[in-house]
Amino acid sequence: MFNPLKLIPTGVSTKQDKTDLGFASAALRVPTGLFILNSGLGKFKADKQTAEFLQGMAASGMPFVKEMDAENFAKLLATAETGLGAALLLPFVPNRLVGLGLIGFSGGLLSMYFANDAMTESDGIRPSQDGTSLAKDSWLAGIGAALAALPKK
């Protein structure tokens, strides 16, 4: 009879196990880090109109953002995204730390998605045509959770 408990590691790890974890970590971190880093670097060039758009979108999920100056918000967002992207690409930053950072970042994106009725269908879950661009960011939460759950090296 199949026993799923036999699939759980017993704590003894081999060099191959550590290599596999390194590959899994890199496969999660590199494309995500490059994507977020590129997005953050692009926001440093945001003009006033773009900064106001970014602030308005963020304020739909996090109302306290309205109190900030739009251009300062855009710079803060650019810095945060660039920092998170860079941290994902630096192998000495622990998986758990970057995973938690990614979960927080994804939470901010998803708060905009769920707070804006135009982003979802009438059921409040499935994305509308307008909401697809934000709903797809749910994969960031999954990657963050996977990184946070990886065992220490």
PLM region descriptions:
Residues M1-G83, L90-K153:
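Membrane-interface extramembranous regions
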